[in-house]
Amino acid sequence: MAALDGLPPLRDVIQRHGLDARKALGQNFLLDLNLTQKIARTAGALEDATVFEVGPGPGGLTRAILALGARKVIAIERDTRCLPALAEIADHYPGRLEVIEGDALKTDFETLAPQGPIKIIANLPYNVGTQLLVNWLLPKAWPPFWQSLTLMFQKEVGERIVANEDDDHYGRLGVLCGWRTEARMAFDVPPQAFTPPPKVTSTVVQLTPRENPIPCAVSNLEKVTQAAFGQRRKMLRQSLKPLGGERLLVKAGIDPARRAETLSVKEFCLLANSL
């Protein structure tokens, strides 16, 4: 990457700015610049896109996104220690990197989004990644403001995102992702690619919005998935009792003796629409 963008190696940047990944912030710095380029390429053509990045840290992925030609990167960083390193990247790419100090969970991404294609590419902090994904999946208006999500998670979370019915990993997250997006696991990232190395393998997931998901009220789908998977080993007549139980299931044409993990996304939407 140094030969590609003329900036110093990331290890030098981290040492010079006294940066260390903090567990409390869910940080694991990705220092393998071949991998950061691979992640950025997974998002497809970037030349006309504005890219949101969450938790850029010392900027390894940020540099890859900019080097591959993104029109602009808007990076949300909570850790003020990382801001000087990111400022150096901004100086190297005048007018193309905007760094916003703040909490991504409290950030209104849609309001910040300029006109044109929007992509979100991020090595998400482990402690907020799933909630951020759910936030991006559940706006009332659809299609969303973003064109694609290219996100790194712990592999176990990635498996939940892409899971279908009758899969051990299938749950509320799989239903929400399958309802509104087409999701795939692109590739795994080993622990040794990070500083410090996490205890688990990570994976990069690519999500693109479905143009016409099954019509369904977001709030109702959240209710039925939360109730059904909250007691996933019980029959639906029992787990959905607070929402109407057997009466609701009969109305939706679903056998009350089935369990949550056997229902397809379409069937969960039938339940939500029967509330």
From Swiss-Prot:
It is an enzyme of class 2 (transferase). SUPFAM superfamilies: S-adenosyl-L-methionine-dependent methyltransferases. InterPro entries: KsgA/Erm, rRNA_Ade_diMease-like_C, rRNA_Ade_Mease_Trfase_CS, rRNA_Ade_methylase_Trfase_N, rRNA_adenine_dimethylase, SAM-dependent_MTases_sf. It is found in: Cytoplasm. Gene3D superfamilies: Ribosomal RNA adenine dimethylase-like, domain 2 (1.10.8.100), Vaccinia Virus protein VP39 (3.40.50.150). One of its GO terms (molecular function) is RNA binding. It comes from the Bacteria. The keyword Nucleotide-binding does not apply. The keyword Metal-binding does not apply. It holds the Pfam family RrnaAD. It catalyses: adenosine(1518)/adenosine(1519) in 16S rRNA + 4 S-adenosyl-L-methionine = N(6)-dimethyladenosine(1518)/N(6)-dimethyladenosine(1519) in 16S rRNA + 4 S-adenosyl-L-homocysteine + 4 H(+). GO terms for cellular component: cytosol. PROSITE patterns: RRNA_A_DIMETH (PS01131), SAM_RNA_A_N6_MT (PS51689). Its EC number is 2.1.1.182. Keywords: Cytoplasm, Methyltransferase, RNA-binding, rRNA processing, S-adenosyl-L-methionine, Transferase. PANTHER family: DIMETHYLADENOSINE TRANSFERASE (PTHR11727), DIMETHYLADENOSINE TRANSFERASE-RELATED (PTHR11727:SF7). Belongs to the class I-like SAM-binding methyltransferase superfamily. rRNA adenine N(6)-methyltransferase family. RsmA subfamily. Specifically dimethylates two adjacent adenosines (A1518 and A1519) in the loop of a conserved hairpin near the 3'-end of 16S rRNA in the 30S particle. May play a critical role in biogenesis of 30S subunits. This is Ribosomal RNA small subunit methyltransferase A. It comes from Rhizobium johnstonii (strain DSM 114642 / LMG 32736 / 3841).
